[in-house]
């Protein structure tokens, strides 16, 4: 027997038993975002490697350790996208979407990072991202946070997530702070692990995000970034907090929140849950006002967020919020000469008469017992039975698979009866 081929480690199939919950999540996300007037954009999953090196940062873990990079047959270095913002910015610049007008966009799809697979973290994972270009006020920052808060309510998980905010200021604000932070870290060099020692010289703000408890202990005495913010950054963050207060959205200011990608400035935020065991981020974002110019476009303010769909699916499963629409409403059972085609015609009539109805025909033969067993297995609530007599009389037997009652109807009126049952 030939050796079976397995999926790549950390890249999972979404099976028929799982896809209804995914569809429910994706549809809810799309409906919430669309309610704010945002438009979908679809980008390739493969980009030039240089795009991510320039946008995300050479020294970030994503670029230095986690990207799937390869040379194509022309010798060009290409990368499976590890995140969506850089590709969205590239698309907007290339297609002149932000030269004269603001843009409010969203996208959804697979991303790739070569990480150690674990619960809620995979090598192929799915994100939904929302990006706004051309608006620089705290009002649009607040709208994005309000959008995510609405999504949590729609999904029923709003009591299981909490919001953390920070302002990391402008590039100029951070320059003096970096100097002060590095000086502090050098005084505690013996406590730092190798990762933080490296970050101290490449991106010292990332040390604030360490999970090492020994280093976390000394960071309580570290210089505070808020004390180095300029007046514009302070006013922007105060305006955001005021808008969130007015909207009734609770939050915590976490001065160690910096996010893991180099392009952020001013506002950064994360939605965090403890429902998955260890504390985990389900959504994060912030401002990246310099990224468009950095990638060759005109200076353009921008803000956005991304959410991990696998983690949201895990939350829904953990919290037992998995009610989804059944995949089959009506199962058509047939037996006898000429009944198969009659059953297929009736199914087509029902699909036209009842918007969204899901009708499955039985194929493969078998007696009524076998066919009803299959109807139960696929979760149908109604079975339609067609024998030779029913075909001759243009009737059909409708059986309620929940209550057990059955009755014979003219085929012309059965759609109305089914619509009342499902």
Curated annotation (Swiss-Prot):
Alphabetical list of CDD domains matching this protein: HisRS-like_core, HisRS_anticodon
Reaction catalysed by this enzyme: tRNA(His) + L-histidine + ATP = L-histidyl-tRNA(His) + AMP + diphosphate + H(+)
Domain of life: Bacteria
GO-annotated biological processes: histidyl-tRNA aminoacylation
KW Ligase (keyword) present: yes
InterPro entries referenced in this protein's UniProt entry, alphabetically: aa-tRNA-synth_II, aa-tRNA-synth_II/BPL/LPL, Anticodon-bd, Anticodon-bd_dom_sf, His-tRNA-ligase, HisRS-like_core, HisRS/HisZ, HisRS_anticodon
Keyword Protein biosynthesis belongs to the record: yes
Stretches that traverse the bilayer: none
GO molecular function, one term: histidine-tRNA ligase activity
Subcellular location: Cytoplasm
EC number: 6.1.1.21
Gene Ontology CC terms, in alphabetical order: cytoplasm
Keywords: Aminoacyl-tRNA synthetase, ATP-binding, Cytoplasm, Ligase, Nucleotide-binding, Protein biosynthesis
PANTHER family named among the record's database cross-references: HISTIDINE--TRNA LIGASE, MITOCHONDRIAL-RELATED, HISTIDYL-TRNA SYNTHETASE
Subunit (UniProt): Homodimer.
Similarity section: Belongs to the class-II aminoacyl-tRNA synthetase family.
Protein name as annotated: Histidine--tRNA ligase
Provenance organism: Vibrio parahaemolyticus serotype O3:K6 (strain RIMD 2210633)
Lineage: Bacteria, Pseudomonadati, Pseudomonadota, Gammaproteobacteria, Vibrionales
């Amino acid at each position: 027997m030939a050796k079976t081929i397995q999926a790549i480690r950390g890249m999972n199939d979404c099976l028929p038993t799982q896809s209804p919950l995914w569809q429910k999540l994706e549809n809810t996300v799309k409906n919430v975002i669309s309610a704010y007037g945002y438009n979908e954009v679809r980008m390739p999953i493969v980009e030039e490697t240089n795009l991510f090196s320039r946008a995300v940062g050479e020294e970030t873990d994503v670029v230095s350790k986690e990207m799937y990079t390869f040379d194509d047959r022309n010798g060009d270095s290409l990368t499976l996208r590890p995140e969506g913002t850089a590709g969205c910015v590239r698309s907007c610049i290339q297609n002149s979407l932000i030269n004269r007008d603001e843009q409010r966009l969203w996208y959804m799809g697979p991303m790739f990072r070569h990480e150690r697979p674990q619960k809620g973290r995979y090598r192929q994972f799915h994100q939904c991202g929302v990006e706004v270009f051309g608006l620089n006020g705290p009002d649009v920052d607040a709208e994005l946070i309000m959008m995510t808060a609405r999504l949590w309510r729609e999904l029923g998980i709003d009591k299981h997530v909490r919001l953390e905010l920070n302002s990391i200021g402008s590039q100029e604000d951070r320059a003096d702070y970096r100097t002060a932070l590095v000086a502090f870290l050098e005084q505690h060099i013996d406590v730092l692990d190798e990762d933080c020692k490296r970050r101290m010289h490449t991106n010292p703000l990332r040390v604030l995000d360490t999970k090492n408890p020994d280093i976390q202990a000394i960071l309580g005495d570290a210089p505070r970034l808020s004390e180095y913010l300029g007046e514009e950054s302070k006013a922007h963050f105060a305006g955001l907090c005021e808008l969130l207060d007015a909207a009734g959205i609770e939050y915590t200011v976490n001065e160690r929140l910096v996010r893991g990608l180099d392009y952020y400035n001013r506002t950064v935020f994360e939605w965090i849950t403890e429902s998955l065991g260890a504390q985990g981020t389900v959504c994060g974002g912030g401002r990246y006002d310099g990224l468009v110019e950095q990638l060759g476009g005109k200076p353009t303010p921008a803000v956005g967020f991304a959410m991990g769909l696998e983690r949201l699916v895990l939350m829904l499963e953990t919290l037992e919020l998995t009610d989804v629409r059944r995949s089959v409403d009506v199962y058509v059972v047939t037996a006898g000469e000429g009944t198969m085609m009659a059953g297929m015609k009736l199914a087509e009539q029902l699909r036209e008469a009842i918007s969204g109805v899901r009708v499955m025909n039985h194929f493969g033969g078998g007696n009524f017992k076998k066919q009803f067993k299959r109807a139960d297995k696929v979760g149908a609530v109604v079975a339609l039975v067609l024998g030779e007599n029913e075909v001759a009389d243009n009737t059909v037997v409708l059986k309620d698979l929940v209550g057990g009652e059955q009755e014979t109807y003219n085929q012309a009126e059965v759609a109305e009866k089914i619509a009342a049952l499902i």
